[in-house]
Amino acid sequence: MKKTLLLLTTALIVSLSSCAKQPQATTENAAPTEKTEKKDSVIVKTLPAGIPVDDILKTIIKEFKGEVVVIDFWATWCGPCMYAMEQIDPIKDSYLKAEKPVAFVYITGETSPLAKWQQTIPGIKGYHYRLTDKEFNGLLRDLGIRGIPTYYIADKNGQRVYDNIAEGGYPGDEIITAQIENALNKK
C-alpha cells in the first residue's frame, strides 16, 4: 500500500513538473535531410509511410549517419522513464555543448497519449518519434524489449555498440557515458 501511494505521488509530481511552459517542438519529416536543425532543440520526426516493422530501427539510425545514436525507448506514463531522462540530461548537455556527433533519439508509441506526449517533449531535447501501436509493439518485439526505459546505442556507422534490452531500466551515468565514448572512438 505504501509503495503504491509513493509510486502514485511520484507519478503526480513528475506529471505536474512536466506541465511547466517549455520551448515549442518543431516537426520534421523522416526523409533524409541536411543537419540544419539545432541539436539542442526538440525535433519531432516521422517514419516514411508503409515502412516494414523490420526496417524501423535501421531507418531511424540511418537518419543520423556519422553520429553516435543514443536511443531511449520510453512512454509518458512511465515514471522510471521520466526519471531516467532527468538523469541523462547533464550527459546530453555535455555532448551538445562540446558539439560532439551524438544524437539523442526518443521513441514511444500510442500508449503515450498524443496530448500528453506533445505536452511532455518540449522539455526533452533531442529527436522524437511517436510510432503507431503496430510499429512500436513490433519494434519492441523484434528487439526483444520487455520493459521500458530501455537504451540502445549505435556507433557512427550504425552498428550496435550497447543495449540494455535484457535488463531494461536506466543503466546509470557511468555506463551511458562509457558506451557513448566507446562508440565515438570506434573506427
Question: What residue ranges belong to the model's regions?
Answer:
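A short beta-strand-turn-helix
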Residues: 48-69
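N-terminal targeting signals for export/organelle localization
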Residues: 1-51, 187
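Conserved hydrophobic packing residues within short motifs/helices of P-loop NTPase cores
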Residues: 71, 105-107, 152
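Extracytoplasmic/secreted envelope proteins and their assembly/folding machinery
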Residues: 54-61, 85-92, 114, 118, ...
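Conserved segment of the thioredoxin-like fold in thiol-based oxidoreductases
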Residues: 93-135, 145
